[in-house]
Amino acid sequence: MAQTFLGQKRLRKYYGKIREVLEMPNLIEVQKSSYDLFLNSGDAPQPLDGEGIMGVFQSVFPIKDFNETSVLEFVKYELEKPKYDVEECMQRDMTYSAPLKVTLRLIVFDVDEDTGAKSVKDIKEQDVFMGDMPLMTPNGTFIVNGTERVIVSQMHRSPGVFFDHDKGKTHSSGKLLFACRIIPYRGSWLDFEFDAKDIVFARIDRRRKLPVTTLLYALGLDQEGIMDAYFKTVSYRLEKKRGWVTPFFPERVRGTRPTYDLIDAASGEVIAEAGKKVTPRAVKKLIEEGSVTDLLVPFDHIVGKFAAKDIINEETGAIYVEAGDELTLEYDKDGDLIGGTVKELIDNGVTNIPVLDIDNINVGPYIRNTMAQDKNMNRETALMDIYRVMRPGEPPTVEAASALFDTLFFDSERYDLSAVGRVKMNMRLDLDAADTQRTLRREDIIACIKALVELRDGKGDIDDIDHLGNRRVRSVGELMENQYRVGLLRMERAIKERMSSVEIDTVMPQDLINAKPAAAAVREFFGSSQLSQFMDQTNPLSEVTHKRRLSALGPGGLTRERAGFEVRDVHPTHYGRMCPIETPEGPNIGLINSLATFARVNKYGFIETPYRVVKGGQVTDEVHYMSATEEMRHTVAQANATLDENGKFVNELVNTRQAGDYTLAPMESVDLIDVSPKQLVSVAASLIPFLENDDANRALMGSNMQRQAVPLLRAEAPLVGTGIEEKVAIDSGAAIQAKRAGIIDQIDAQRIVIRATEDLELGDAGVDIYRMRKFQRSNQNTCINQRPLVKVGQQVSKGEVIADGPSTDMGELALGKNVVVAFMPWNGYNYEDSILISERIARDDVFTSIHIEEFEVAARDTKLGPEEITRDIPNVGEEALRNLDEAGIVYIGAEVQPGDILVGKITPKGESPMTPEEKLLRAIFGEKASDVRDTSLRVKPGDYGTVVEVRVFNRHGVDKDERALQIEREEVERLARDRDDELAILDRNIYARLKSLILGKTAVKGPKGIKPGSEITEELLETLTRGQWWMLALEGEQDAQIVEALNEQYELQKRALDARFEDKVEKVRRGDDLPPGVMKMVKVFIAVKRKLQPGDKMAGRHGNKGVISKVVPMEDMPFLADGTPVDFCLNPLGVPSRMNVGQILETHMGWAARGLGLNVDEALQEYRRSGDLTPVRDAMKHAYGEDVYAEGISGMDEDTLVEAAGNVTRGVPIATPVFDGAKEADVNDALTRAGFDTSGQSVLFDGRTGEQFARPVTVGIKYLLKLHHLVDDKIHARSTGPYSLVTQQPLGGKAQFGGQRFGEMEVWALEAYGAAYTLQEMLTVKSDDVAGRTKVYESIVKGEDNFEAGIPESFNVLVKEVRGLGLNMELLDAEVEE
């Protein structure tokens, strides 16, 4: 691969051994493709039938009015251009969305009174505005009211049919009761279940159960039809009073002991004697010979069988037996036959009786028994029964019942299986219905019951509902589609009513439609759905992970309380689809998961993972994506199976997975092999080096804590990485990539201007301007700041990283810092995972981060008059106003502390009635400062920092103050600068093309002084201004046309640029849309640098976390033999019990990387002294090894090599991919090459005494993160603050400026000490004794020290509660009694 500019800057030594044939897919593909499909925009594939906005409109329209004289049809829809771009929406607290325009057609019919025939009377088409449709930003998020939100994908049970049993829990006998459930995408659920007596019942929507035959009758089957559907028929033929002749099935007698002799009906010989076991050999012989087809069975053997058909007297129509009736014989005392249905049949000459083939072993009589219990016999009564269950209390009629039953399962408006449901149902029941058949059919219901009965008979298996073939993912697009459908259906009702009530001939479609419900549904979904979440923006990794999250919670999903262990557990089908490691600790464990690195979601919503195809033991490079169901049919080998250089398996037996089991299989039988070892974990887990050496619980914490790492002031990529850091940085959108190749034209901290050299289209200026995000606040108050990595004049290729973002370093994810750590105790300061740090870390800002807080204040129009933002605040001294400008708004750059005023604001307060004197004074001196109170925005306790940005928003038509005008001027200047740059590059490009077109051609005429027919040369052009070049008319017709076209293009682009500029300026100058009642709004952003200090939480990448206990002077820290003091001391006891040995390997590997870097550094110093490059080349070869050197480094020229070497002097970065990284031997080898001992331990000296420690200590380089749990955000103390309204007790929590609860146990402690006065104080004046509180304040002010406690307010609350129960309770004073 061609080394990009950045790759040359810093090479990573790669330890992976397995060649990857497939590049990791884009990490936020899930979000983007799903929403593209919904909007049917971009280059997304065509959606399936009825998907996306189009599908929603098609399913709701056409809308007919109640008497069908008019129809409203949907023609097409179109999304217009969004009014504001992403940036503007974030600044103005708006939603990033595009107006949705729908073309509707209203058709009015004329109905002939007599014939009822319809003829079209009128057709009207019109574009109707249907509200705004939120758009997704390029990074897969949504901007809603100015904040970035993510819609998390939901895992839910796939529609289709599921078979299950109750695990023997329902009935005391422990008998398994089987059940079957048909789950549609939307519509009524249909359940079938057995009870303990083996009767089959059906339930609709979990209501009262009905015998299943009632449902079958309602479907239009009769008794014979039902028997036919579920049982085979055998005939019993009477043989001259000797017995019955019936077909013989040899299989059924295998291993049984017959109760009677089995006699061949044809020959009369006994083929098996009664009471003797029939051996399998005998059965086999009978099957092979095949001579015995019928048996002769005893006469009374027919008793207890059931008739398969109605047997009727053809002439009289009398029914002897009905289908399903039991056949009986009755004998008297002497054993003579006196009655029974069989006698009646024989007497009437029926000697061939069709009987249900039920043997109670292979086939049970469940459906027949159910039918016998069912009191319904026909469709009408069955329908009425169903109606009574569904609509209890309403009088049933046959018509209503029939209509209800039809709409339940067979009406596409009310019931939708969805394409997925239909596919799953066809697969499970072996049906062949078309994918477009989205409702149930009669055959489906019959097949479900049949499969359920077969399960009860012991055929087939129940389904595993946690199998990923039975759970699917609903992504943004689909969730949004469901929500929009709900909105449109609400709208449909209103439209229908309006169509009936208005004069239909005169209205247009616009008059019928009120788009509010649809717009409201969308707004509600994005604003308050459980799945629409505030984006976790702490660092780029947390963004990516949030977008790849899969939640089982949410509407239509599980709830935390109801979810059992099975749902949360890791399932074999998760392999390569969902990460087994990354999930939250706590109540949501296992319910919220992360998509695996290579996984993707297919069109049906099932998660697929890629495999390479294996043919005859030979691994090919062909890659197939498989869903969990497809994978069950294959044998899959692990990615680390040993292959030879041609890709053939080395071992005869290979470790494989087959249908969820792990087996050793011969290499010929292997069909697939994993694409990569990291395909089974998520992005966060695959960022942990040596993950394979960590315990899973700690790996889980490691993955979760990386997401909480705060972006530091200077990012530093890990020395020991895994090789996917670059992928995360780019896909998260933190680093900026070049959209197309070009040359860097100009650059400053705010933007990069690139002159494109490729992908130029006609009418394209060929300029790309990339704006950096400078010190913006993220959702989590961390700082987003981008800085350029390229230089002017440099050539960049498409997709190259041109700017770093937060937590990225040279295009790689960099969440923390590489620091020197020693695993050793130090005076007990690392007890219980505490961390001891050197003062250097705090002094050199190693772990310093910037945090930005946003404060806003709004001036409203109140009943008493408008609030005003001003510098003129009553009773506030000049000192407090020192940071405000004349408009009353704080300066940028002001240092502020708690209590400082940021924005001065006054609010009018109710006028007290004026005395005559005041009236007189006011009449003389004019308007006195009417009563106002100070409601300024002040800095909250615990916040301090520097003001970095101020934004002022004004309502339309409100005069702008000086500050707002100044901000506006700056913004317009910035836009003008952009326009001028684009224009300059456009000029340069166009004139260069013009010059190449006209040089050497002949001019027919031109401006003054040009002779017709003269040749155009460089000299001639220099005598003219560039604008005059266009006046040169060329000789050739074609040439003249080309120049003309170029000129037109130039003018067109200039006009487009100007128009775009004017539009933006207009947006800046126009007033803002503020909430009702708000006249003006000011936002102030304060940034603060937070250094590392005791109480801050830090963590490594292996789940090793701790809190800083002490900052030690650098000279007191333990130091190495060369005098280097260590930066961190960690507790060695934190490793063995937690089994995250990966951190130790990382420490050793980092130490080796640093040693090799120091070697390169020495070689560079030698080169600077002598000018000889050989030592540098040798050092690089030594550091990277022969192969990498030959491939990437040997061909570099001097400057490039020196730059590449200069970038690795702090340490040679390495990549050790998960499950395929450096082994122990590699670590030893690296340590040896760096010149260290393979134990990885060094001799340390005590910084305070200078003495050597008793034994060598493990010292190395470790990558540590500072987490978003900073002590500054947690520390808090209450002085006097707000009280709860009812109980009058102080509030709790930092946000409420609350106190610490003095609880029950603390009271016991004071009681135990007998500290009565302290206790009384705690329970009264320091808590909720309102009168006492004020008295104490007074006495303190007066300097007295005695006070009385009164009655606590909570006691009054108790008294009121008791009175509420109707018991009068009063407090009486003891003295008064006397």
UniProtKB/Swiss-Prot annotation:
Pfam families: RNA_pol_Rpb2_1 (PF04563), RNA_pol_Rpb2_2 (PF04561), RNA_pol_Rpb2_3 (PF04565), RNA_pol_Rpb2_45 (PF10385), RNA_pol_Rpb2_6 (PF00562), RNA_pol_Rpb2_7 (PF04560). Transmembrane segments: none annotated. Its EC number is 2.7.7.6. InterPro entries: DNA-dir_RNA_pol_bsu_ext_1_sf, DNA-dir_RNA_pol_bsu_external_1, DNA-dir_RNA_pol_su2, DNA-dir_RNAP_su2_dom, DNA-dir_RNAP_su2_hyb_sf, RNA_pol_bsu_bac, RNA_pol_bsu_CS, RNA_pol_bsu_protrusion. Keywords: DNA-directed RNA polymerase, Nucleotidyltransferase, Transcription, Transferase. It comes from the Bacteria. It catalyses: RNA(n) + a ribonucleoside 5'-triphosphate = RNA(n+1) + diphosphate. GO terms for molecular function: DNA binding; DNA-directed RNA polymerase activity; ribonucleoside binding. GO terms for biological process: DNA-templated transcription. Gene3D superfamilies: 2.40.50.100, 2.40.50.150, 3.90.1100.10, 6.10.140.1670, DNA-directed RNA polymerase, beta subunit, external 1 domain, DNA-directed RNA polymerase, subunit 2, domain 6, RNA polymerase alpha subunit dimerisation domain, RNA polymerase Rpb2, domain 2. It is an enzyme of class 2 (transferase). The keyword Coiled coil does not apply. GO terms for cellular component: DNA-directed RNA polymerase complex. Belongs to the RNA polymerase beta chain family. The RNAP catalytic core consists of 2 alpha, 1 beta, 1 beta' and 1 omega subunit. When a sigma factor is associated with the core the holoenzyme is formed, which can initiate transcription. DNA-dependent RNA polymerase catalyzes the transcription of DNA into RNA using the four ribonucleoside triphosphates as substrates. This is DNA-directed RNA polymerase subunit beta. It comes from Ruegeria pomeroyi (strain ATCC 700808 / DSM 15171 / DSS-3). The gene is rpoB.
